[in-house]
Curated annotation (Swiss-Prot):
Homotetramer. Its main location: cytoplasm. PROSITE patterns: ARGININOSUCCIN_SYN_1, ARGININOSUCCIN_SYN_2. This is Argininosuccinate synthase. L-aspartate binds at residues 119, 123-124. L-citrulline binds at residues 87, 123, 127, 175, 184, 260, 272. Pfam families: Arginosuc_syn_C, Arginosuc_synth. The gene is argG. The lineage of its organism: Archaea, Methanobacteriati, Methanobacteriota, Methanomada group, Methanococci. ATP binds at residues 9-17, 117. It comes from Methanococcus maripaludis (strain DSM 14266 / JCM 13030 / NBRC 101832 / S2 / LL). InterPro entries: Arginosuc_syn_C, Arginosuc_syn_N, Arginosuc_synth, Arginosuc_synth_CS, Arginosuc_synth_type_1_subfam, AS_cat/multimer_dom_body, Rossmann-like_a/b/a_fold. It catalyses: L-citrulline + L-aspartate + ATP = 2-(N(omega)-L-arginino)succinate + AMP + diphosphate + H(+). Belongs to the argininosuccinate synthase family. Type 1 subfamily.
Length: 397
């Protein structure tokens, strides 16, 4: 009888580490583990490989997808100013790419199942499975943590029983996810929205009170909506994002603490560190204000909001997302220029912006310019708000 193989999306954390053994113990699968490199720390890639080999997987793969993630996902998110309830979608953006890589490998090795470590209350189950079912509908999806209805405490107990080293305990049961675009921290005491996030939860950003005592200026150059240089230095995609993370992070910029609405309908308290994401999106929006017309800006704001909503829900493969990209790409053909930001102890302000495609006209807007005759505006002003004036008259009768 041919052995059953499950390809497991493996991060080395508590959930997926438990899945390594659960797939064997409860489902009778042999496991192939996969870590997809989307910019997480090197140790976060070495650790899964070492753990996987220790626990006897058939094979462990590490797939380098950093460049693809930066160019095909992050840069699209920047052009869309993609923020969901103030969150720049760091985890959400990476999930479809990870799912695609896992599904492709599962097909390649002839796997019977694809597995992930998502719980039944989180968003990632939707993000992974919507893509996996679209790409590999013939392959079963197994989610042991969800399907066995395990709690965090039960997982920790199971891990200890099986001798699985995990980076959490009952005192600090934080769940941390990290990639090129940001870092998320959730769980444990953070589930109480009245509890301040402990300093030790943060790794990318210094506490604003501890940041340097002088302002730092950073200049971002854009070409067709994509960041291409920092302070005049042209950089490749991955290097550029890492550099911006470093600059913003040392100034305490990029911490997000929100209560967000999950796909399932639950509200969840989430902490994020996204210094580079927040800086680049802020800079990009400032450039758009200089270049796009009022009607374009108003409509694009609606498009951007829907775009972020689709990404958050895991609907990267939804045709509407491609349609929105087509509109966004058209607006970005004129998005060429530079933006200067001033960073200081957690604050970020626009200090300057310029573009050869700017609709902003300094001469025309000047109070000293007579090119626009002010007297010609009288008729326009007279009838501005006409319907409201008519309504007001009716209410006085």
């Amino acid at each position: 009888m041919q052995e059953k193989i499950a390809v497991l999306a493996y991060s080395g954390g508590l959930d997926t580490s438990c899945c390594l053994k659960l797939l064997e113990d409860k489902y009778d699968y042999k496991v192939i583990s996969v870590a997809v490199d989307v910019g997480q720390p090197e140790d976060d890639l070495k650790e899964p490989e070492e753990k996987a080999k220790k626990f006897g997987v058939l094979k462990h793969y590490t797939i380098d997808a950093k460049e693809e993630f930066a160019k095909d996902y992050i840069f699209r998110a920047i052009k869309a100013n993609a923020l969901y309830e103030g969150y720049p979608l760091s985890t959400a953006l990476a999930r479809p790419l990870i799912a695609i890589k896992i599904a492709e490998l599962a097909q390649e090795v002839g796997a019977s199942a694809i597995s992930h470590g998502c719980t039944g209350k989180g968003n990632d189950q939707f993000r992974f499975e919507s893509v996996m079912r679209a790409k590999t509908p013939e392959i079963e999806i197994v989610a042991p943590i969800r399907d066995l209805n395990l709690t965090r405490t039960e997982e920790i107990a199971y891990a200890k029983e099986k001798g699985i080293p995990v980076p959490v305990d009952l005192e600090k049961p934080f769940s941390i996810d990290e990639n090129l675009w940001g870092r998320s921290i959730e769980g444990g005491i953070l589930e109480d929205p009245m509890t301040e996030t402990p300093k030790e939860c943060f790794a990318w950003t210094v506490d604003p009170t501890d940041a340097q005592d002088k302002e730092e200026y950073v200049e971002i150059d854009f070409e067709e909506g994509v960041p291409v240089a920092i302070n005049g230095d042209a950089l490749e995609a991955v290097s550029l994002i890492r550099k911006v993370n470093e600059i913003a992070g040392r100034n305490g910029v990029g911490r997000v603490d929100i209560v967000e609405d999950r796909v399932l309908g639950l509200k969840s308290r989430e902490n994020y560190e996204c210094p580079g994401a927040m800086l680049l999106i802020t800079a990009h929006k400032a450039l758009e204000q200089l270049v796009l017309t009022r009607e374009e800006l108003v409509f694009k704001e609606m498009v951007d909001s829907k775009y972020a909503d689709l990404v958050y829900k895991g609907l990267w493969h939804e045709p509407l997302r491609l349609d929105l990209d087509a509109f966004i790409d058209k607006t970005q053909t004129r998005m060429n220029g530079k933006v200067v930001l001033k960073l200081y102890k957690g604050s970020m302000r626009i200090a300057g912006r310029e573009s050869k495609d700017a609709i902003y006209n300094e001469e025309m807007v000047s109070f000293e310019n007579k090119e626009m005759d002010q007297r010609e505006i009288v008729g326009m002003v007279k009838f501005h708000g006409l319907q409201a004036a008519i309504y007001e008259g009716l209410t006085r009768k």
